[in-house]
Amino acid sequence: MIIIPQTKGGVGKSTVAMQVIAPYLYKKHGKKITYIEIDDENNDSKSFTRTEIVNKKMLGTNRLTELDELILMDDNHEVIVDVGGNNTSSLVLDEIKKVGSFGNIKWIIPLGDGELDGKNAIATMKKIKKIEKNPEDNVIFALNRAISMDEDYYNEQFINFFGHKYLDSNSVICDFVKDPKYFPVKNDKVITMSRYLGSTVWEMAYNNTDFAAKAIQAKEMGDIESARKYLFFRRIQTEAKDYVLNTLNKIFYDLDRWIDIKK
C-alpha cells in the first residue's frame, strides 16, 4: 500500500497520487490500481473522469477501520491512499497507529517549497515514525511543483528540505533525516491540461490517436476549426510525451529502487 499524507492542504497530494504513483503502479502491475481518497471536504479525484488506470473509491473519516484489513492484505502495493490535509491526515495517521503498518506501507509525503510546507512535512514524518519500525526505508518525500529537474536548481528551490548554508533555514527535513529518499515533481501546464481532459499525463502520452492525421483529414474536408482542434491535441500529446520522458521516467527509476513489487 502507498499512503500519501500531509497535515497541510494544498501541497499537491492528489497530483503526486494520480500523476506519479498511479501510472507507476499501473505500469508495474499491468492492471488497474485501487485508488482510495480520504477527504470529507474535497474530492480531487473526481476531475479524472476518463482515466483507465485506477478504480476510484471515496472513504469517509467515519469508516477508517476499513483500512485495517486493506493494510494487512496489500503486501504488494496495489492500493493508493490519498489522504486529505489538515485534520484528516492527523486523524488517519492516529487510526493507523492503533493497528500498525505490518511493514506493508510506503509513505510518500509531498511538499512545496514554502516554509510552512516543510514544517508540516516534518510534523507528518514525526507522526509516521510513531507507526513505522523502519521509517528510513519506508518514507519518501515528493518535492512538488519543482521549477526544474536540475539537481542544483531544486536544491536551492527547496530550502525547506535541503537547507542552505548562507540562508536562515531552521528545521529543514535534512536536519531530521540523515539520507532522505526523495524525488522532484516538475510543474508543467500539461498537468493542468490533463485534469481538464479528465485523464493523467501518462495516459495522454500513450494515447494512440493520430491527431496529425486527423488534422490533415479535417483540412482536406475544409473543416478548418476541427483541424485547429486536432493540432491543439497533437501539441498536448507531444508535451505529455516529453513530460513522461523527462520527469516521470526519472521518478519511476528512483521508485524502482525504493519500492519492491513482486511479479
Describe these PLM feature segments.
Residues 1-24:
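Walker A (P-loop) phosphate-binding motif
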Residues 3, 80-82, 108:
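Structural motif
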Residues 26-44:
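Short beta-strand-centered segment that lines the nucleotide-binding/catalytic pocket of NTP-utilizing
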Residues 41-56, 159:
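P-loop NTPase switch/communication element
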Residues 58-69:
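Glycine-rich, highly charged phosphate/nucleotide-binding loops
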Residues 76-93:
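Switch II (G3) loop of P-loop NTPases
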Residues 88-183:
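Conserved catalytic-core segment of NTP-binding enzymes
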Residues 140, 145-263:
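C-terminal lobe/tail of nucleotide-utilizing enzymes
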